[in-house]
């Protein structure tokens, strides 16, 4: 068994993929301890040829899969998780990003030392921010073994993000729950990552950046996030995530925490994304969002967290929705929502 599996979807990254692959080949944990699963998502440039070249040079480390059609990152990652991952731990690294040589060894040793289900780490788009050696790193450990601790954990977004790239996951822990990414959409991660917040018992958080995140102007996410339908996909994935927690996990114990999460991600974030890109807030969309929110949270103002420190935007949005539910004036609501930044 390999110590670590790395899952990497690849699409039209000929300019960057060698930098990524070299950063994996040069890991101090050793190539014999790495399983690198590369899923080419029907690239139209030289990405497949580069993958084949590295696969030939490192046949015991690299497993390459070539999709005949583009199926997006969520489906690629699910294919890897369902069929190929065999390491003790696994992580996701994008094909236009890179990690320092100590990355996998440090995360593996830290996870083993603390018996961690998940390690949350930090990323940076500035290479100067990346810690030069593991001696520069510190971490905190969080143990969610009571309801109160879990609630505190769910309410503190600084501990764990919704990004899959910044996580190192115990395969035995994952096999117990078997979360999946949303498929066929651009904003696929929350359906996989948010349930981790409800289930991981031992979490380590690295305090310094160790993952280099490249802002690729030609990357899929940069392109997708400029499209109206992608923003709507974000909203629908958040609804799917809420329903998953409701159906499969203990939502009753953490109902108010999940409501707060839903207000923020389904409603507030969607409006912020649209406003930031100067996309229209149509009456049809806003009515739909209000209708779904009312179904999920019939008495939205009864949430005890609203108005407490750190929930200003949640309270503001809840007030707007509650006012609309009472007076039905969609024009007034849209004008208020346009002011959200």
Residue ranges and their predicted role:
Residues 16-18, 45-53, 98, 102:
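Acidic helix N-cap motif at the loop->helix transition within catalytic regions
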Residues 90:
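Short aromatic/hydrophobic "clamp" motif used to bind/position activated sugar donors
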Residues 74-76, 95-206, 211-229:
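Donor-binding/catalytic cores of nucleotide-activated saccharide
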Residues 116, 275-341:
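Membrane-interface aromatic/basic loop that binds lipid-linked glycans or pyrophosphate carriers
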């Amino acid at each position: 068994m390999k110590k670590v599996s790395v899952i990497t979807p690849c699409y039209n990254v000929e300019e960057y993929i060698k930098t990524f692959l070299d950063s994996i080949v040069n890991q101090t944990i050793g190539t014999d301890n790495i399983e690198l699963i590369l899923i080419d998502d029907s690239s139209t440039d030289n990405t497949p040829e580069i993958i084949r070249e590295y696969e030939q040079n490192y046949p015991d480390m690299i497993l390459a899969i070539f999709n005949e059609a583009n199926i997006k990152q969520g489906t690629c990652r699910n294919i890897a998780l369902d069929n190929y991952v065999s390491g003790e731990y696994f992580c996701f690294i994008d094909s236009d990003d890179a990690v320092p040589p100590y990355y996998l060894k440090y995360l593996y040793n830290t996870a083993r030392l603390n018996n961690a289900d998940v390690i949350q780490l930090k990323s940076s788009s500035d290479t100067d921010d990346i810690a030069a050696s593991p001696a520069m790193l510190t971490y905190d450990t969080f143990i969610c073994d009571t309801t109160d601790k879990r609630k505190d954990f769910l309410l503190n977004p600084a501990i764990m993000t919704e990004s899959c790239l910044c996580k190192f996951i115990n395969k035995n822990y994952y096999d117990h729950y078997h979360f999946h990414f949303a498929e066929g959409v651009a904003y696929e991660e929350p359906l996989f990552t948010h349930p981790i917040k409800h289930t991981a018992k031992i979490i380590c958080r690295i305090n310094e950046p160790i993952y280099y995140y490249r802002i690729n102007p030609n990357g899929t996410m940069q392109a997708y996030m400029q499209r109206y339908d992608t923003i709507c996909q974000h909203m629908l994935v958040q609804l799917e995530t809420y329903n998953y927690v409701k159906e499969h996990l203990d939502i009753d114990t953490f109902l108010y925490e999940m409501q707060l999460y839903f207000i923020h991600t389904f409603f507030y974030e969607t409006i912020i994304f649209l406003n930031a890109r100067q996309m229209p807030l149509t009456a049809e969309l806003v009515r739909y969002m209000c209708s779904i929110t009312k179904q999920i949270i019939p008495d939205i103002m009864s949430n005890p967290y609203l108005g407490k420190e750190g929930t200003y935007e949640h309270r503001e949005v809840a007030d707007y929705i509650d006012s609309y539910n009472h007076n039905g004036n969609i024009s007034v609501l849209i004008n208020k929502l346009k002011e959200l930044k």
